[in-house]
Amino acid sequence: MGLLRIMLPPKLQLLAVLVFGVAVLFLENQIQKLEESRGKLERAIARHEVREIEQRHTADGPRQEVALDEEDDVVIIYNRVPKTASTSFTNIAYDLCAKNRYHVLHINTTKNNPVMSLQDQVRFVKNVTSWKEMKPGFYHGHVSYLDFAKFGVKKKPIYINVIRDPIERLVSYYYFLRFGDDYRPGLRRRKQGDKKTFDECVAAGGSDCAPEKLWLQIPFFCGHSSECWNVGSRWALEQAKYNLINEYFLVGVTEELEDFIMLLEAALPRFFRGATELYRTGKKSHLRKTTEKKLPTKETIAKLQQSEIWKMENEFYEFALEQFQFVRAHAVREKDGELYILAQNFFYEKIYPKSN
């Protein structure tokens, strides 16, 4: 542009700048259209795959009821919270599915909307419970908790999840929107080009780093009620705690992901046999790291911690962490700095009537 200023008169310089600006906007628009087309293509391929599976099972006449062993009649739902190491964990499930003989399915919602419409809730519940060809199944996606019992389902799925320190999660998400990660480095992100650091955003009172953006893990566990998404709702916090204890099989934390995987392998070997060793030996390939991430200053953290929203999200995180550590303490023993799963610690006796 310096050369243009020397060679061109002012009017032509202005025209050149305008043309350049229009060209940039045009290119950004074309890139956005390509991304939308790619998303539509992915959804079309997924629908085609589903139809192919259904056609294979109806080609020879009416669909036969598939009798499943009790061990195979299991569905796990991992309603993953964004930026909690969810991709790292899900990749392990994909790597193990062929070996351990189960199916992995991604729940791809339009624009990553975590709240399903009522009609989609009905469809989803019906799919998950009646799609026997996909059992045992591991479903994952950015979807808030859905209570299957309200739809009259006899056998509910097993819910699992992972959560993260709320400020660390927000910082990671902030930079992810701008710079992406090492998983798909070439993909253009929504905020790409915005070089403002998280500290600068907080200091300026920006919307992308506002305390309201912390409100995510609570509504994901609270569910599909309107009050769950009312930022700062004490009812939503208590409902999220209730669901975590009563509706989730296990909830881990990002900071102790290996222990979470170890407990799942011990309790649900049908799905997770070999997961701990895979995580340990393949750590570099499974971990997904946000690029260009800068840790926030103490001043930035202190400012966010003044928010009532942070206090509530942190209360939920501490509640989940305490519960996870309680479960772990009763499932493992430590020796020489290593954790080992406890053997079966109960047995049956005094069995009557006596067999002859």
UniProtKB/Swiss-Prot annotation:
UniProt protein name: Heparan sulfate 2-O-sulfotransferase 1
EC number, as in UniProt: 2.8.2.-
Molecular function (Gene Ontology), one example: heparan sulfate 2-sulfotransferase activity
Origin species: Gallus gallus (Chicken)
Family: Belongs to the sulfotransferase 3 family.
Disulfide bonds: 201-209, 222-228
Topology feature Lumenal, residues: 29-356
Cellular component terms (Gene Ontology): Golgi membrane
Gene Ontology BP, a term: gene expression
Bilayer disposition of the protein: Single-pass type II membrane protein
Coiled coil region boundaries: 24-51
Designated gene of the protein: HS2ST1
InterPro entries: Heparan_SO4_2-O-STrfase, P-loop_NTPase, Sulfotransferase
TM stretches of this protein: 12-28
Organs and tissues of expression: Expressed in heart, limb, head and trunk. At stages 20 and 24, it is expressed in the most regions of the first and second pharyngeal arche. In both wing and leg buds, it is detected at the overlying ectoderm and mesenchyme throughout stages 21, 23 and 24.
Function: Catalyzes the transfer of a sulfo group from 3'-phospho-5'-adenylyl sulfate (PAPS) to the 2-OH position of iduronic acid (IdoA) or glucuronic acid (GlcA) within the heparan sulfate (HS) chain and participates in HS biosynthesis.
Alphabetized Pfam families for the sequence: Sulfotransfer_2
PANTHER family: HEPARAN SULFATE 2-O-SULFOTRANSFERASE, HEPARAN SULFATE 2-O-SULFOTRANSFERASE 1
Locations listed in the record: Golgi apparatus membrane
Effect upon mutating residue 189 to A: Only transfers sulfates to GlcA moieties within the polysaccharide
Assembly and interaction partners: Homotrimer.
Topology Cytoplasmic: residue spans: 1-11
Keywords, in A-Z order: Coiled coil, Disulfide bond, Glycoprotein, Golgi apparatus, Membrane, Signal-anchor, Transferase, Transmembrane, Transmembrane helix
Residues that, per the record, bind adenosine 3',5'-bisphosphate: 83-88, 164, 172, 279, 285, 290, 293
